[in-house]
């Protein structure tokens, strides 16, 4: 491959050169949403983070199988395997079938992801569609001696596993810390110790979502689904497993334990985790009740919002921070992102207005190299964006006559902006934003202004003024130049 990509491996706590197990093929699994409510800003971050990774790996020439699951069963209210299934609870409260809840919110999630220009994964498996695979996983762990049956449920024996392996190697915890911080909850008497986690839960009589198993009717534990589905679609060993850093413990720690217990080693080579979106320093999330949904951002309908923000503003806002850095929500930060995005899109539009010269005194090759170097450095999107802003200054200086650019360099500059703005960062011009409207109305405005040029040549000042005044009233700024005209749509 042309580029040497390094990524931060949470397991080893350092940046490592990315070397696929079976190049040019790459297997990537990312934990998707539990679909019992509308997607919020916290859901957007992992989706955008791993969308950029998917795009970049594809750009580097890899053939990526990207699996992003849908959790539609087994995610209980508490990590200690207690409480009601989140989807079943929503269904009970709204007097719906659980799969009605799943389908409704999954449709809305897909719509929000499409608005954010997040590419669909190669495969989007549902936990409820892979019960057989999860039962087989539980059987293997039982056969290996790292699980036990208790009153119709099956639990992973963390203490026994820890004697032979290292439970806590991903999160940096040791078993004593886990035991000391595990809450004693009702129903824990089924477990040998409070740190044990459910592989299969017995269904109470009132529990709607249930399947037959060798241990009686029940449902899979939350952690089992990703191990089972990752193995089914990516094999016993694959390259990347991603998700939010809030999943490191217990979810991903438990996945490693399940993998090692069932097949003897870890399935995953690189573990990647994005940091959190916060509001006033507190993690944004459904369980905390402090979230703002993506639809509320797009409409401006939440009380904390001073205005609506377009999907591309949200995407740009997230990409302005490195994926491993926290991002704190504020209207000021989003408004700054909105202005920055507008500057970048104006630069892209201005590329079409440049007339090439015979020679160049700008360094396009260096700009391209710097952008790739930033992406190769653990997907450093904020540095890529800063280089693109340098490119925007280059464009403005060329238009102002301070620099010149040859036809070949202009072609390369257009390619740099298209590759990084659109193909890799996944930005797009939006109909409804000023940039999107410029793209949509461009030919019509150009045609009208060409008529105005003809009117002026014929000294038809009334028609010339009428066209200018009408376009100005619609928000277009018209500038006469020696070559004809320039225009832009003001916000």
Curated annotation (Swiss-Prot):
A motif ('HIGH' region) lies at residues 33-43. It is found in: Cytoplasm. GO terms for molecular function: ATP binding; cysteine-tRNA ligase activity; zinc ion binding. Zn(2+) binds at residues 31, 226, 251, 255. One of its GO terms (biological process) is cysteinyl-tRNA aminoacylation. One of its GO terms (cellular component) is cytosol. Keywords: Aminoacyl-tRNA synthetase, ATP-binding, Cytoplasm, Ligase, Metal-binding, Nucleotide-binding, Protein biosynthesis, Zinc. SUPFAM superfamilies: Anticodon-binding domain of a subclass of class I aminoacyl-tRNA synthetases, Nucleotidylyl transferase. It holds the Pfam family CysS_C. ATP binds at residue 286. SMART domains: DALR_2. Binds 1 zinc ion per subunit. It comes from the Bacteria. Monomer. This is Cysteine--tRNA ligase. Its EC number is 6.1.1.16. InterPro entries: Cys-tRNA-ligase, Cys-tRNA-synt_Ia_DALR, Cys-tRNA/MSH_ligase, CysS_C, Rossmann-like_a/b/a_fold, tRNA-synt_1_cat_dom, tRNAsynth_Ia_anticodon-bd. Its cofactor is Zn(2+). It is an enzyme of class 6 (ligase). It catalyses: tRNA(Cys) + L-cysteine + ATP = L-cysteinyl-tRNA(Cys) + AMP + diphosphate. Belongs to the class-I aminoacyl-tRNA synthetase family. A motif ('KMSKS' region) lies at residues 283-287.
């Amino acid at each position: 491959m042309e580029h040497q990509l390094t990524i931060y491996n949470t397991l080893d706590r350092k940046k490592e050169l990315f070397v696929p197990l079976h190049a040019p093929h790459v297997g990537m699994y990312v934990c998707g949403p539990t679909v019992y409510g509308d997607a919020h800003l916290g859901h957007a971050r992992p989706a955008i983070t791993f969308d950029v990774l998917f795009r970049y790996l594809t750009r580097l020439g890899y053939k990526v199988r990207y699996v992003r699951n849908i959790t539609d069963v087994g995610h209980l209210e508490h990590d200690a395997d207690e409480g009601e299934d989140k989807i079943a609870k929503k269904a009970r409260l709204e007097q719906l079938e659980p799969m009605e809840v799943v389908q409704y919110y999954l449709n809305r999630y897909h719509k929000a992801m499409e608005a954010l220009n997040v590419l669909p994964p190669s495969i989007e498996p549902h936990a409820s569609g892979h019960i057989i695979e999860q039962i087989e996983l539980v059987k293997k762990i039982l056969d290996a001696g790292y699980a036990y049956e208790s009153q119709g449920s099956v639990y992973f024996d963390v203490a026994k596993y820890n004697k032979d392996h290292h439970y806590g190697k991903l999160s940096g915890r040791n078993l004593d810390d886990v035991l000391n911080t595990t809450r004693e909850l009702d129903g824990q008497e089924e477990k040998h110790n409070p740190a044990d986690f459910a592989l299969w839960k017995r269904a109470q009589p009132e529990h709607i979502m249930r399947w037959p198993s060798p241990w009686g009717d029940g449902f899979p534990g939350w952690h089992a689904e990703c191990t089972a589905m990752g193995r089914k679609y990516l094999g016993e060993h694959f390259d990347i497993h991603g998700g939010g850093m809030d999943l490191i413990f217990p979810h991903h720690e438990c996945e490693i334990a399940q993998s090692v217990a069932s097949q003897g080693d870890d399935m995953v080579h690189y573990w990647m985790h994005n940091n959190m979106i916060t509001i006033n320093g507190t993690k944004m999330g459904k369980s905390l009740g402090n979230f703002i949904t993506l639809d509320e951002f797009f409409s401006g309908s939440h009380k904390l919002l001073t205005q609506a923000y377009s999907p591309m503003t949200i995407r740009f806002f997230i990409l302005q921070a490195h994926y491993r850095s926290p991002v704190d929500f504020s209207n000021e930060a989003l408004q700054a992102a909105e202005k920055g995005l507008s500057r970048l899109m104006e630069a892209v539009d201005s590329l079409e207005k440049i007339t090439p010269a015979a020679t160049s005194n700008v360094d396009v090759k260096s700009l391209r190299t710097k952008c790739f170097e930033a992406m190769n450095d653990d997907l450093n999107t904020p540095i890529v964006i800063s280089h693109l802003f340098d490119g925007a200054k280059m464009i403005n200086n060329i238009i102002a006559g301070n620099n010149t650019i040859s036809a070949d360099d202009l072609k390369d500059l257009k390619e740099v902006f298209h590759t990084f703005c659109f193909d890799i960062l996944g930005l797009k011009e939006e109909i409804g934003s000023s940039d999107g409207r410029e793209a949509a109305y461009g030919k019509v405005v150009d045609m009208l202004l060409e008529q105005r040029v003809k009117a002026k040549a014929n000294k038809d000042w009334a028609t010339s003024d009428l066209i200018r005044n009408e376009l100005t009233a619609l928000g277009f700024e018209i500038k006469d130049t020696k070559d004809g005209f320039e225009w832009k749509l003001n916000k």
